């Protein structure tokens, strides 16, 4: 049984994808009040934003114990981020590795901006906990997904706002198979199926074909990782190496 911090409310960064949907469920099991926050930054796969409402509605209707805890949703226009980012996440270009070793899907400063804005909203809403789906196990090397980055950001935000906000990253040390397993632990097969069908991960925004592991093109790094993680989860295995 996961403990509940009744006195604390949480704001979850919720994109509409697998990881953030799992984080919403994690927070709903843990906190009495959970609000969600999404960002429209001109992402190529903005279909994920269209999935958010369906996921929230499904969580309310299929999990009665969580229905009363799921609070307001916030959507922020961050089109300026897309305007200054020449990446495969915001442009229709081929996904490849750049000279610095990072994939060109990396959007510089994205998670730093996300968490800063989230902290400002949480401060205003009286919420003490921020929850993000950052992960340093199955990831593409994004520096703003690292544990050290999140810890440093927590310090900076608390100093800058003279508060005591806590940044929670429940997926930080989980691989994708373990993320699927966490969903099962939180909400059983019903939550796994909700995440499989209702969330979106594919970088190119393909949502025409439903695979065993969910919708997607099946070829981009995000789809390959989700597919491998789901297959390993079904077999009870771990996935520790992200695909190229």
Curated annotation (Swiss-Prot):
Residues annotated for Zn(2+) binding in this entry: 202, 217, 220, 223
GO BP terms: queuosine biosynthetic process
Catalysis performed (reactions): 7-carboxy-7-deazaguanine + NH4(+) + ATP = 7-cyano-7-deazaguanine + ADP + phosphate + H2O + H(+)
Disulfide bond in keyword set: no
A Pfam family reported for this protein in Swiss-Prot or TrEMBL: QueC
Molecular function GO labels: ATP binding; ligase activity, forming carbon-nitrogen bonds; zinc ion binding
Matches recorded under InterPro entries: QueC, Rossmann-like_a/b/a_fold
NCBIfam families to which the protein is assigned, alphabetical: 7-cyano-7-deazaguanine synthase QueC
Function noted in UniProt: Catalyzes the ATP-dependent conversion of 7-carboxy-7-deazaguanine (CDG) to 7-cyano-7-deazaguanine (preQ(0)).
Protein name: 7-cyano-7-deazaguanine synthase
Gene behind this protein: queC
């Amino acid at each position: 049984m996961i403990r509940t911090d009744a006195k604390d409310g949480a704001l979850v960064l919720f994109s509409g994808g697998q990881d953030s949907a799992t984080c919403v469920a994690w927070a709903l099991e843990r906190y009495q009040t959970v609000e969600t926050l999404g960002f429209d930054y001109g992402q190529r796969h903005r279909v994920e934003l269209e999935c958010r409402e369906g996921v929230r509605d499904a969580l309310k209707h299929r999990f009665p114990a969580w229905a009363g805890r799921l609070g307001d949703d916030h959507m922020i226009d961050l089109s300026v981020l897309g305007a200054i980012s020449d990446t495969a996440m915001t442009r229709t270009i081929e996904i490849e590795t750049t000279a610095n070793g990072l994939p060109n899907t990396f959007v510089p400063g994205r998670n730093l901006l996300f968490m800063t804005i989230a902290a400002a909203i949480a401060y205003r809403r009286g919420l003490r906990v921020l929850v993000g789906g950052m992960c340093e196990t199955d990831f593409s090397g994004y520096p703003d997904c690292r544990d050290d980055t999140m810890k440093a950001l927590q310090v900076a935000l608390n100093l800058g706002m003279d508060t005591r906000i806590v940044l929670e990253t429940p997926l930080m040390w989980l691989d994708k198979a373990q993320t699927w397993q966490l969903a099962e632990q939180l909400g059983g097969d019903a939550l796994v199926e909700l995440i499989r069908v209702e969330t979106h991960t594919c970088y190119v925004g393909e949502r025409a074909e439903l695979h065993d592991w969910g919708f997607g093109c099946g070829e981009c790094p995000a789809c390959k990782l989700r597919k491998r993680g789901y297959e390993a989860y079904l077999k009870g295995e771990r996935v520790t190496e992200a695909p190229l």
